[in-house]
Each structure stands twice: as structure tokens, then as C-alpha cells.
Amino acid sequence: MIDPVYSAAPDRYHGGMKYRRAGKSGILLPEISLGLWHNFGDVDTLSGSKEKIHHAFDKGITYIDLANNYGPSYGSAEETFGQIMKKSLAPYRDELFISTKAGHDMWEGPYGIWNSRKHLMASIDQSLKRMNLEYVDIF
């Protein structure tokens, strides 16, 4: 079955979502963010995840929060989001504020553990690949 083309709601910024300035950065973030912890891994279907993300975006929720270990299996939330990003949200990338985190043991050996520079650099590279992104807004 071919997915219908997603077109964001034209009134997504006029539906009542409030935005607040984040610290001294000047960036405006919605009062509600969408955290993709346990609900966007291999337990949920891609279509169910896509429906939830599209609905949130259509309501003005533009801040998506992930981490390298989110999902029932590590990295699966980022992978699922990456598929959705590639298939339907890519035209809206500049309207999205995407964050991800590292800090969990993700692979064997001395370099896959907590917060060494090597671990963090490898973690962001892997996260970007899983999400089909060139950058994130906060890491």
C-alpha cells in the first residue's frame, strides 16, 4: 500500500499552541514537546507512529525529543523517526526542533561507555544516521 502524501495543516501555528522563549537563546519552543521514548520503537507500528507525529505537528508541536537508547530496542525510536522524517517530514525540517541525547552504553568495548569525547562523537554520528538527518538542534 502506498502512503498518501502528508501535507501539514495550514493552520498549525494558529490553533492555540503557545510558544515560550528558551533561556537566553532566543529560540521559541512550544509549551508541549513530543518525547519519543518507549512509544516509538519496534513495538509500535510505523503507521501508528507516523500518525501520532503528524497529529502533533498539525497542532503546532514542533519540538521532538529523542535519545540514542530510546525504544524497546536501543536506537529503534530514532530509526522509526528517521523513516517518518525521510518519507513525510523532510519538507518541514526547518520548522522542527529536534533534540537527541547520548550517555548510555550502546556498544561493547571501552569506547562505548559514558561520555568520553569519542563516545559522544560516535553517538551523535550514529544518531544522525538513524534519523536520516544532517544535524540536530540540541545534543
Annotated model-derived regions:
Residues 1-96, 134:
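N-terminal binding-site loop/beta-alpha segment at the start of enzyme catalytic domains
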Residues 88-117:
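Structural motif corresponding to the early beta-alpha repeats
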Residues 80-84, 97, 101, 119-126:
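Generic beta-strand or strand-like secondary-structure segments
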Residues 58, 107-139:
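Glycine/proline-rich, positively charged
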